[in-house]
Amino acid sequence: MKSQLLGGLTPREFLRRYWQKRPLLVRGALPGFGAVVTKNALATLAARDDVESRIVERRGGRRNTRQGPFERVNLGKSNSTLLVNGVNLHVPGADALLQRFNFVPQARLDDVMVSYATPGGGVGPHVDFYDVFLLQGPGRRAWRVENKRFVVEAGDLLYLPPGVRHDGVALEPCFTYSIGFRAPRGAELGAAFLDWLHERGLPQAEYRDPGLAPASRPGRIPGEMVSFAERLLKRITWSRRDIERFLGEYLSEPKPHVVFKPGAGRRALARSLVRLDPKTRLLYSGARFFINGESIELSERNATPLRELADRRVAQGARLAGSRLGGLISHWHELGYVILEKS
């Protein structure tokens, strides 16, 4: 289905022609788009310990960055920007905005960062190493993307693939909503996988050399020690299933500052609407599910309705009220992973 959000393209057309290939500017992607969050509400979020925020101020040719939390947000009348990450975790409207982009797998969705800038405000020319949609809220912003210049207004949407140099400057007090995507790097992924293997137990062995002879060249690493290390490391093996499980747990792991609030009260699951908490990441591969860094494997019968919850982030409780699944949902509610609402 063609989407106004994507300039009249279907998601398939957009992904084929633009995704990770070239920028796209969509005028009027969300006509009449207003503020999902106010300036004061954004400042309130910036005061919290569980929210990442920063202020960037331009003075002459230099920019100064201060990290939050801030007891009080004081922005200059010009050349200042407040940026708050993960607004979708705290503001339902921002979470709904993020879900408009669910034609991209949930494993790739990251968060909604909101910036409020005074005239002249901006973070400066830079390159991101991830895909991003930049949706303009109230107020105008001038963009320079590579060698092109243009001005955006409320409801305009700019898509940028990784590696494209860009610079945005507020022409008047304005909001910009950045919908970012995760793109794990090889070194980061490799280090995390080795940690994951270590937690599950690596081969235990201790180097011994009872036949050691006096060293004629003390600085040389003994060949026997190299052989020992080679034999030991060759015993470290893994399967595709191990990689799948690691990746699911890794991609669903909440960010360090995320805190879940335990569910309050009891509600009959069969008469409830089950909604994932905005902070919850629920992914799956086959009948194995990954939620907030944990994994569980279910029967196909139980997996089918849970996939619906993962895909849509909301499901009728009656679909999830089986004995095994019902107990699981109740446990997740106690942990604050899901919200039970009146159906």
PLM features: residue spans?
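Active-site region of the double-stranded beta-helix
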Residues: 1-17, 30-156, 164-206
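N-terminal auxiliary "cap/dimerization" subdomain that precedes the catalytic jelly-roll/cupin core
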Residues: 1-63, 287-342
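Hydrophobic/basic alpha-helical segments enriched in Actinobacteria
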Residues: 88-93, 154, 181, 281-284, ...
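Generic recognition of stable, solvent-exposed alpha-helical segments in well-folded globular domains
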Residues: 153, 188-189, 224-227, 324-327
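Long, charge-rich alpha-helical interaction segments
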Residues: 194-252
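Acidic, low-complexity/disordered tracts enriched in E/D and polar residues
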Residues: 234-309, 330, 341-343
